[in-house]
Each structure stands twice: as C-alpha cells, then as structure tokens.
A protein has these predicted regions:
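The catalytic "switch" region of P-loop NTPases
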Residues: 1-92
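C-terminal leucine-rich, beta-strand-based interaction scaffolds used for sensing/assembly
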Residues: 95-273
C-alpha cells in the first residue's frame, strides 16, 4: 500500500503518509511470507523483551522501559533506578522473598502491557487505602492478586477467541479448574484427563490429552520444570529461528514436571494445593 497507493498521492510535499504494521512475532512468522526472518532483521523494528537470567533484570530492555516510565514522571529524572523509589522492597511468596521486579516478572509473560496493568492495579489499591506509594502488603494482598489473575484470564480468553467460541473456551477453563494442582507430573495430568467429566467433548474440540497439554504450554499457562530449577516457558524459548518451539511428546515421561503460571492461581483455583 505504501508503494502502490500512498506514493501516488499528490501534494506529498505537505507530508508523507505511511502505514506501519504492528504485530506479534508468532503471527508475523506464521503469515506465510518468504524469508520472514530476514524481513524482521532488515526491515523491521523488532521489540524483544526476552531475557536469560532474572538476576540480571536491571540490564534488560524491559526493566529499562518500565524504569523510564517512572523517570519520565519524576521531578529529578535521574539515571538512578526510579523503580526502587516506588517498589524498593521485597515481596513474600510462601517462604521466599523476591525482589519486587522479579516478582512482577513472574506474574507476567514479560510484556510491557502486563506491567502497565500491574502498576494500574497497584495505583488503584493505593488510592483505596489513601496512601501515596505501594507496599509489599498491597502486592501480596488477595485483592491485588485476584485483580491481576482476572486480567490474565481475560487476556487468555481473548487470545483463544481467535480459534474457539465462548462455550469451547469455557470448557477448557473448566478442565483447568478441574486439575486443582499448581504443580503436577505428566502422570497426574493423564489421571485428571481420564476422570474429567467432559473428556469426550474436550477431546472432540481440542484433541487428545497431549494436544491439550501442548495448548496450555503454547499459551503460556504451564511450563516444563527441568532439574527442579529451570522453568521452560514458551514465551522465553520462542525466537525468530525457533518460533514454532513447543512440547515434544517423545521427551515426556510419567515423571515430567509441570507448573502453572503464577497469574492463573486465583482465577482457576490452583492456589488451593
């Protein structure tokens, strides 16, 4: 359109109109374009929010972006971490304490819009409590956790809505709630599948038990736990060269461990066990 249509507009000396496509990496790479990887490298502005290690988060583009949001609103506008001016505290989860940014990272899928939502919820909670800045107690509260879990579930519903209708998505959500375990093995998952009261309907729409598990993985609902310490998430493993990364059935054993995303716990009742 830019070359065939807009380039023919008269009086272009008054300004130039161009259309810029904004899209997700997975959608672009699955659009059937030739040399899609080269188009991203040579003809695109690729916004990559991925990171390798949580402990190195101060060096990531995602942290710099979020931190700059605070710096822009700060009167000092210094290079010093503005994040710490508002969230310079540890957040407890179970028996562990987390740096606030790492805690937020684990609630998200490393997307800026997730952080915007988290900050909006924190602001609303501060206003409700008549305090200026957030506290660890606000972030740890059931109100905060439930509000973000609802947002996460609605985002998932929207993404699934491109492929399934409302009743089909509800059936999938019912199955997730039926699991009732935040951490589970492949064997436990298979047992849940066998006992699910709508198994036949679920299988007719979404495929067999592995295909449903693969769907949960591809939509960042679950991760594979390796060596009890490394969490293999789809959004972290997916790259331009490996954009179709997914579960491999032959790699799974009955003892393969999975974990649901933190943000699913409240909405799907997975925090119960």
């Amino acid at each position: 359109m830019n070359s065939d249509l807009l380039s023919r507009i008269k009086d272009r000396n008054k300004g130039r109109l161009q259309i810029v496509l904004l899209t997700r990496l997975d959608i672009f790479l699955n659009a059937g374009l030739s040399n899609a990887g080269s188009k991203i490298s040579d003809n695109s502005a690729f916004l990559n929010w991925s990171f390798i290690s949580e402990k190195d988060y101060p060096k990531t583009d995602l942290f710099l972006l979020v931190n700059n949001m605070f710096n822009s609103a700060s009167k000092d506008n210094k290079e010093q971490s503005a994040w710490d001016n508002y969230f310079g505290f540890k957040i407890k989860r179970g028996q562990k304490d987390f740096d606030s940014f790492v805690y937020f990272l684990r609630l998200t899928t490393s997307k800026p819009r997730d952080f915007v939502k988290l900050l909006k919820i924190a602001k609303e909670q501060c206003q409700a409590d008549y305090i200026e800045n957030p506290t660890a107690e606000i972030i740890e509260s059931d109100l905060f956790q439930r509000a973000y879990s609802t947002y996460f579930a609605e985002s998932l519903r929207t993404a699934l809505g491109f492929y399934y209708d409302r009743e089909q998505i509800k059936l999938l959500f019912d199955f997730i709630k039926f699991i009732k375990l935040r951490r589970f093995t492949y064997q436990q998952y298979q047992n849940v599948w066998i006992n699910f009261y709508e198994k036949n309907a679920l299988e007719e729409i979404f495929g067999n038990e592995f295909e449903v598990l693969e769907l949960l993985f591809n939509f960042n609902l679950v991760a594979v736990i390796e060596d009890d310490s490394y969490y293999r998430w789809k959004y972290r493993e997916c790259t331009i060269a490996n954009y179709d990364y997914s579960l491999q059935k032959n790699d799974l054993t009955p003892d393969t461990k999975f974990v649901f995303h933190w943000a699913t716990e409240k909405e799907f009742g997975l925090y119960l066990k």
